[in-house]
Amino acid sequence: FNWITDLYVKHFTKVPLVINYHRWMGAGKDWAGEENFDPDSKRLLDSACEKGFSLRHDAFGMREYYGQRERNYVKPWIMKRPVLLEGGWIVSKHPYHNDPSGYKTAKDVRIGEFEDGQEAHVNMMDFRVGDETMSWFRDAYPLVERFISEGGYRLYPDSIVVPKEMKSGSRIKIVHRWNNLGWGYCPTNIPQWNQKYKVAFALLNQDNQVVYSYLDNNTDLSVWIKGYPTSYEFTPKLHGVKKGTYT
């Protein structure tokens, strides 16, 4: 396990890596009853996450295969590593009526998957392909719309204070505050991204072209969590700015 995860980390330095948080990790089993699991799975999965792996599961909505053990495992990693959702039931083929949740329709299955994803604060929803994708749009389109507006990360500045007039060569103060309307987070903290995304400000000329730009290196998008606005004071120096009107 360490050999293969180390190999991926070594060679995929710019691409996010993802691992399934399965209860039988490396144990040669797929399932042995809801109450059973390999106690070593948590240690192995934690080691992968600490190396920079993100998390996914392919049984969301299945009350047996995505049970309390899976829910408990992912909790400490929420907002530390992004979580990806894939539903377990293929509604056109699987006997989803047997699920302990008592699903009666395909819409019920989609609701169960969505609610499990909301609980895990997932960043992405995998609609699969073919009939499964069609089911999401046919049977549960309002949930698709909800994920677009609520899921993952939805970042916006609700306050930006800048001076109206500035003097070239002077240092100005910009106060900006950011909110996340999504239940997920922007995973700039994963090693493959390594904080590569930051907030920047620019002066635009009358043709709406960027002529000067300033990067606020103190911003960390991964800590912007829903319900907790984050504020910054940025004091760039306007070196070499020509006299004029900018936006």
Where are the model-predicted features located?
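Short, acidic/polar linear motifs in exposed loop/turn regions
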Residues: 180-184, 207, 238-242
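Structural beta-strand segments of beta-rich domains
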Residues: 170-174
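Catalytic-core regions of glycoside hydrolase
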Residues: 2-131
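A beta-strand/beta-hairpin structural motif
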Residues: 211-242, 247
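Catalytic cores of secreted or luminal carbohydrate-active enzymes
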Residues: 110-163
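Short coil-to-beta strand junction motifs in C2/discoidin
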Residues: 187-200
